[in-house]
A protein has these predicted regions:
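Histidine/cysteine- and/or acidic
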Residues: 171-280, 292-293
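Flexible, membrane-associating and regulatory peripheral segments of lipid-active enzymes
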Residues: 2-153, 159-170, 180-194, 220-222, ...
Length: 538
């Protein structure tokens, strides 16, 4: 049933994408014709491969469709629509002032509440969204609570609608226009230039931020301080070269959060490639916890609405990127949001990359607070390549969890050998006291499968934190199958004999080794509290 739901969702995903291409073919044919266009108050004549966009005597940019904008990996490439149609709005928010629309044509710093010497954040949306969407307002509000800053919301909703290929083209123009606004602001920032500017974009908005950065560099010789890409869109951007897509060269620091990076044909909306100075892959960057329900369950949760249910099903992984980022803005003393560098997520979850190293060079804070640590400890070494970081999150808010590496050694005693191996799963609860009456975590599942006598099993799990790791509670859950006689236990009680368990806490840098009391086996469904002093019986 789960497989069917997933396949049905992928099929619908493909259908929706194809429907969004309606009209793209005709636009593509026309885009190679000879143009005479009126944009704003100015007239321009374009060649068959270039269009220029201007208003009130200000040219925002001239765009062509030559390589790399059209390539084997991007066979369809369009011009942006008319400026008068897609003209973006810029909504400025500062502490103590009501949101106001910033007019680019007659920008006057004295008529706004913008303080050019304070941090400047730009936040923008993706395909089929607008600047008034809840997640953008949540990020803006949280940034303003966290520090005295300027937040500029880029609303390009007039150009973000279908077909998708046209929205892809429109962000080139929106990025160029936004770069001109930032250039005007930079006239008031002095030596800071735009080092204190940070552009944050989701999906198509992430690549839009890249176009802001490239335009600032090419036209004004200014490099923006930071760009954060929240699951940058994959369709039309995968396997293409900069400046077609966002890249670490677009800003002094580029960090990417990948949450839906499966290939598009498999249902993924986000780009797979590592394209930033730091690329975070929560939960491996694909299937996010809490997003595993079938499409029909989402329709049911949406009160039977097919459209809303399918939309939530298709976008759950994709929107996790801005949900994680929002949570990372406000430091939580109870959860540090630590990430670990590792060659692959499989290596990370199997425990091969656990630990931060002597100088903590393997770890980075996740999301918003990662830049300072990166530049202090890693900047020179990793400046020209991508730093790949992994973490495991929870299913629900708060998403931040602490990581534990667990090593389980199954007993090789005679009793264990006589009983033989068992098929099932161990569940761990970390305790802050040896009597089990104090602070404890929620249970978390360990390796599921066959556990043989003398076997050694290691994995990384994530759950809540405890102030001090003092004891571990284990529960064995036996897996039986009606169709597999080897799992039947008719004359014997399902149980497993353990020798010892070692648990290491990444964030708190604690380690504990516990054992079952008097070598007592773990019976199916019966929790057992284990503490270090019980290891004296072995």
């Amino acid at each position: 049933m789960v497989t069917f739901c997933k396949n049905a969702g992928i099929f619908l995903h493909a259908i929706f994408f194809l429907l969004n291409q309606s009209g793209a073919g005709g636009a593509q044919d026309n885009s190679y014709n000879y143009y005479y266009m009126q944009i704003g108050q100015d007239n321009f004549i374009e060649s068959n491969t270039t269009r220029c966009y201007a208003k009130n005597d200000q040219v925002f940019g001239c765009f062509d469709l030559n390589y790399p904008w059209t390539s084997d990996h991007r066979p369809v490439s369009l011009f942006p629509e008319d400026l008068d149609k897609i003209e973006p709005q810029y909504i400025l928010q500062t502490r103590g002032s009501s949101p106001v629309v910033v007019e680019l044509s007659n920008f006057n710093l004295e008529l706004t509440s913008l303080n050019p010497k304070k941090p400047i954040y730009l936040v923008t949306h993706g395909y089929m969204e607008g600047g008034g969407i809840a997640w953008i307002n949540n990020i803006a509000r949280t940034l303003l609570l966290q520090e005295d800053c300027n937040v500029i919301i880029i609303d390009w909703s007039r150009g973000s609608g279908p077909p998708y290929t046209q929205a892809v083209a429109n962000i080139r123009l929106v990025g160029a226009i936004t770069a001109h606004l930032l250039h005007r602001i930079s006239n008031y920032t002095g030596s800071l230039k735009l080092d204190h500017a940070h552009a944050i974009g989701h999906s198509l908005g992430a690549h839009l931020c890249g176009y802001i950065g490239y335009t600032l560099q090419q036209k004004f010789n200014i490099t923006i301080g930071r760009i954060t890409g929240l699951d940058p869109a994959e369709p039309h951007f995968s396997k293409v070269k900069p400046p077609v897509r966002l890249d670490r060269s677009a800003a002094k620091y580029v960090d990417i959060i990948h949450t839906d990076s499966s290939q598009f044909i498999r249902g993924g909306l986000g780009i797979v490639e590592s394209i930033g100075h730091v690329d975070y892959y929560p939960n491996g960057g694909t299937d996010q916890p809490g997003c595993t329900k079938g499409v029909f369950q989402y329709i049911k949760d949406a009160n039977g609405s097919f459209f809303n249910g399918v939309k939530k099903y298709l976008s759950c992984n994709h929107i996790r990127s801005h949900e994680y980022f929002l949570e990372s803005i406000t430091p939580n003393p109870k959860c540090k949001f630590v990430t670990v560098s590792c060659p692959s997520f499989q290596d990370f979850t199997s425990g091969k990359c656990f630990g931060c190293g002597k100088s903590r060079e393997n770890c980075l804070p996740f999301g918003f607070n990662g830049r300072k640590y990166y530049e202090k400890h890693l900047g020179n070494k990793w400046r020209h390549t991508s730093r790949i970081q992994y973490l495991i999150t929870g299913e629900f808010k708060p998403f931040c969890k602490h990581h534990y590496r667990i090593v389980v050694q199954v007993s090789s005693s005679n009793m264990s050998k006589i009983h033989g191996g068992e098929i099932g799963q161990l569940y761990f609860t970390m305790h802050g006291t040896t009597d089990g009456r104090g602070h404890k975590t929620n249970p978390v599942g360990f390796v599921s499968g066959f556990h043989e006598p003398g076997g050694l099993y290691m994995a990384v799990v994530a759950t809540d934190s405890v102030p001090h790791l003092r004891a571990v509670e284990l529960e064995w859950r036996y897996n039986s199958s009606l169709f597999n006689p080897l799992t039947w236990r008719i004359l014997a009680t399902p149980r497993i004999y353990l020798k010892k368990i070692t648990v290491e806490a990444l964030e708190n840098e604690e380690s504990i080794t516990v054992c079952p009391k008097w070598q007592k086996p773990l019976a199916n469904g019966v929790p057992q509290l284990m503490i270090p002093s019980y290891c004296q019986y072995f």
